[in-house]
Amino acid sequence: MGAPLGEREILLGALPRCADPPCAGTWTRLVMNVLRIILGDQLSLELSALDGLDPRSDVVLMMEVMEENTYVGHHKQKIVLVLAAMRHFAETLRQCGLTVDYVGLDESDNTGSFTTEIQRAVARHRPSRIVVTEPSEWRVQAMAKSWEALTGVPVEIRSDRRFFASRTRFAAWANGR
């Protein structure tokens, strides 16, 4: 048996390979990059937002924003733990060969909000679309639903399969209870 696979090999092995078009070399290749958003409570290589990722062109956006740290009272140690986990996960993605646009809380131009940071990322990367796994909080879900209108870029909100049931399935089960 060979050596055990590391995180990089597991992630890259799960990614589909994009075949070159028949005109490769004849035409300038148009890259249709996707901006893939990972939120602070979504630190998983199995996240639906990463399905179909093309490491040659897609960009993963991760943001430390003040609005997430202040909308309710959080213990300072919890905030430090979440930010440290986010930074570690971003580094793991980079080691897997992915392009990560990481907006740190201490960056002078950080606007402090998901929406404006996504608008800034769209201006930087000019993606063909935005993909995000459905946020776990209704407040952030409402924000995600507004991003397409605010950026002019199609937004795909994917189901979060880290839960036992989708929101739709749970709502059907809970109906009338």
PLM-predicted stretches and their roles:
Residues 2-10:
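Extreme N-terminal basic, low-complexity initiation segments
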Residues 31-177:
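Trp/Phe/Arg-rich N-terminal binding region typifying the photolyase-homology
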